[in-house]
A protein has these predicted regions:
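A short, N-terminal "cap"/entry segment at the start of jelly-roll beta-barrel domains
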Residues: 1-42
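Conserved short histidine dyad/triad with adjacent acidic residue
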Residues: 36-54, 88
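Short, conserved beta-strand element in jelly-roll/cupin
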Residues: 44-45, 54-71
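Short hydrophobic/aromatic-rich beta-strand segments that constitute the beta-sheet cores
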Residues: 52, 69, 102-104
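Conserved strand-loop elements at the edges of beta-sheets that form or border functional pockets
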Residues: 54, 61, 78-80, 96
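Short acidic-glycine-tyrosine-enriched beta hairpin
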Residues: 73-89
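Ligand-binding loop in jelly-roll beta-barrel domains
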Residues: 88-104
């Protein structure tokens, strides 16, 4: 049986602290290396607009700041504690006007 894995924010906090405008840092935590059925990670974003094509369903949890997802010309806004489900095969855009941290 595989044991639980702990991920510490302190291990990647320096990446958020050094993020410049227009920057993003993605830290995949769950990948095919440690799971056959799921993916997930942390994404630090700062004043960005990033187009993205989803190849799998995605749940997004906004931990800090404000996050906007654009899909088919419609804006979906998240604040701290908000979540959304985004179905696969959508062409989306991650957007932030300031700093934001999401978990996907």
């Amino acid at each position: 049986m595989t044991k639980p894995t702990v991920f510490k924010r302190a291990d990647i906090q320096h990446r958020k602290d050094g993020l410049e405008d227009g920057g993003t840092y993605i830290k995949p935590l769950v990948t095919v290396k440690n799971s056959e059925s799921m993916a997930g990670g942390v994404n630090f974003l700062k004043k960005v607009s990033i187009p993205w094509d989803l190849t799998c369903d995605e749940i997004i949890y906004c931990h800090e700041g404000n996050f906007r997802l654009m899909c088919d010309g419609e804006a979906y806004e998240l604040g701290p504690g908000d979540m959304m489900l985004v179905p696969k095969d959508n062409h989306i855009c991650y957007e932030t006007d300031d700093e934001c941290t999401i978990f996907y």
